[in-house]
Amino acid sequence: MIEAILFDVDGTLAETEELHRRAFNETFAALGVDWFWDREEYRELLTTTGGKERIARFLRHQKGDPAPLPIADIHRAKTERFVALMAEGEIALRPGIADLIAEAKRAGIRLAVATTTSLPNVEALCRACFGHPAREIFDVIAAGDMVAEKKPSPDIYRLALRELDVPPERAVALEDSLNGLRAAKGAGLRCIVSPGFYTRHEEFAGADRLLDSFAELGGLAGLDLTAPVA
């Protein structure tokens, strides 16, 4: 029987990436720099995981204003803006997520987050979408800079599994991106993928299931662990 479900956050629990993009752009404007990430550029930047890493990549190639602050400070300001936007209640969980989590809790299945986003972002999402602190929803939260290498490295999933004390063959990961799929499979997990707005163009070879919506799972019954791990 399945013992744990590990969730990515951005694009998986909720469609947050447009709000992240808005937070980046509003932060850039507040800092007085002529940077603006449109959807096409942001989609490309998302192939690099981690907000600080995206800013660094952007700075290596952009020809506009230089960075007004260290990257970590820019990212900190963006996180504060994102948390404020989340508090305005503009984001809802993706279809099927709330029911799956509720059913898993009733069944005694442990829940974890394994994400490259920061802990404050996870907390903001949980308070906005669940009305509770993250620790009241998830047994383990592996986030942000808790590991040295971000997805597609499997490190964040390995950390979550260690904290859960659950072997990968007794757990399943839910993801929305190719980097997330690679991270989950690298940790020995089965992985169910439902692409988000910014990842629908990606190829998901190796996914154990590929869904248009997590609502298609039909709850725990859809977490099929009978097939061997790819």
Curated annotation (Swiss-Prot):
The keyword tRNA processing does not apply. Mg(2+) binds at residues 8, 10, 176. Its cofactor is Mg(2+). Keywords: Hydrolase, Magnesium, Metal-binding. The active site is at residues 8, 10. It catalyses: D-xylulose 1,5-bisphosphate + H2O = D-xylulose 5-phosphate + phosphate. Changing residue 20 to A: 40% to 80% decreased catalytic activity with xylulose-1,5-bisphosphate, but no effect on activity with ribulose-1,5-bisphosphate. Changing residue 42 to A: 40% to 80% decreased catalytic activity with xylulose-1,5-bisphosphate, but no effect on activity with ribulose-1,5-bisphosphate. Gene3D superfamilies: HAD superfamily/HAD-like, Putative phosphatase, domain 2. Substrate binds at residues 8, 17, 50-54, 75-78, 115-121. It comes from the Bacteria. One of its GO terms (biological process) is xylulose catabolic process. Its EC number is 3.1.3.-. Changing residue 78 to A: 40% to 80% decreased catalytic activity with xylulose-1,5-bisphosphate, but no effect on activity with ribulose-1,5-bisphosphate. The keyword Hydrolase applies. Disulfide bonds: none annotated. Highly selective xylulose-1,5-bisphosphate (XuBP) phosphatase. Also shows activity towards ribulose-1,5-bisphosphate (RuBP) and fructose-1,6-bisphosphate (FBP), but not towards fructose-6-phosphate (F6P) or ribulose-5-phosphate (Ru5P). Degrades xylulose-1,5-bisphosphate, a potent inhibitor of rubisco produced by the rubisco itself. Belongs to the HAD-like hydrolase superfamily. CbbY/CbbZ/Gph/YieH family. This is Protein CbbY. It comes from Cereibacter sphaeroides. The gene is cbbY.
